[in-house]
Amino acid sequence: MAEAEDSPGEQEAAASKPLFAGLSDVSISQDIPIEGEITIPSRARAQEHDSSTLNESIRRTIMRDLKAVGRKFMHVLYPRKSNALLRDWDLWGPLILCVTLALMLQKSSIDGKNDGGGPEFAEVFVIIWFGAVTITLNSKLLGGNISFFQSLCVLGYCILPLNIAMLICRLLLLAGQGPINFMIRLFVVLLMFAWSVVASTAFLADSQPPNRKALAVYPVFLFYFVISWMILTFTP
């Protein structure tokens, strides 16, 4: 049965009643807190921090990047299982180490017909970066969960011990060549070679499947061995 319609008198009374007439009886309790804080999510804070770097000076930017590179050097010199190189990766440190090592391995020549050892610089540069790219691709094919540039960052920074070995060998060669000198250089190169391998595997060990770690470590061993051999056989 359909509901009965309102009479004309009731409709006129409802129309004449104010719209907010009942709100005057509503009271707000004093116990209800009406103050609060506006929180900014961490991601929004990170974006705000990134945008604030656009306004900083060039000197401050360079110093900040150099400090970050220095901290990563310390992680390599004191290797331990850490995600520092993987989380805050960069290619400035590997580029600096690669250029420095290539310059120290470059032979100088006073013969005008030679180009001063330019191909040797290019050879070292290509070997380092081509080897790092090959190891990274091998890691990805084996099912590693590390990104391409993270792997390049770790492999590049772990050349630091070999740079130290090259510097020591050049200083030893200033005293002349001989069997004792060669044995000292051999010991230094082997020590720094082991240091580079241990440091790189400490950062990359957890990124590979447990049953394929040996297949991932072997190219790393070969990569640093080739660089160590170039350092050991260097003659000014």
Swiss-Prot record:
May be required for stable YIPF1 and YIPF2 protein expression. GO terms for biological process: endoplasmic reticulum to Golgi vesicle-mediated transport; intestinal epithelial cell development. It holds the Pfam family Yip1. The chain crosses the membrane at residues 85-105, 117-137, 148-168, 186-206, 214-234. Keywords: Acetylation, Golgi apparatus, Membrane, Phosphoprotein, Transmembrane, Transmembrane helix. The gene is Yipf6. It is a multi-pass membrane protein. PANTHER family: GOLGI MEMBRANE PROTEIN YIP1 (PTHR21236), PROTEIN YIPF6 (PTHR21236:SF1). GO terms for molecular function: identical protein binding. Residues 106-116, 169-185, 235-236 are lumenal. Belongs to the YIP1 family. This is Protein YIPF6. The modification Phosphoserine is found at residue 7. Predominantly interacts with YIPF1 or YIPF2, but may also form a ternary complex with YIPF1 and YIPF2. This interaction may stabilize YIPF1 and YIPF2. Its main location: Golgi. It is found in: Golgi apparatus membrane. It comes from Mus musculus (Mouse).
